Amino acid sequence: LMNSKYIQSDTKGIYQYVKQLLQSNAYVLFSGTPCQIAGLYGYLRKRYDHLYTVEIICHGIPGQEALDLHLTHFKSTKIISFREKEYGQYASQHTTLEINGDTKVIARKDDLFYKIFAGWLLDRKSCSNCKYASLNRVSDITIADFWGGHYKKEQFEKGVSLLIANNEHGHNLLVKTSNLQLNPSTIKEAINSNPNLYLSLIHIS
């Protein structure tokens, strides 16, 4: 899991486009927050064998206005990456911005947007008691950072990803994906330092 986005994606027109692709028998991999996945299923009103859905473990979604203020502060118009891992998962660098055609990396200690986000101060009220924050996941596959288990920083300097196959459909996709290095784990390890897998913000705070 790389290049996380701490803002909700714009889904305008995307559900209609996905339906068109599915009706033409194209394979579709749709990723988003759990509520976006649920929204897609609600729009389609049926399941397609050639549709695969992937959700992130969501920490709540800030509004667009907060991001716009962040960009204005740094006189930037574009965020290239929210999680720069050139020097590893645990380096101090964090956000990469584009400013006047050049790139600027903002250290984590100077990234106010990230600090406020990590403190759960930017999330929408609708996220505070999210019904999708449950071990009964809505998508075929769930992804996130893997903070639990026995892995050492030195083994995987850019971090370890968590992949959960929530149903047979998702499991079959992972089995077919031959270029992944997969190691088995347990739900107990998965939820270590990842409470949003099963708790909404109101229960965490």
Regions found by a protein language model. Give the residues of each.
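Iron-sulfur-associated redox domains of electron-transfer enzymes in respiratory
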Residues: 1-205
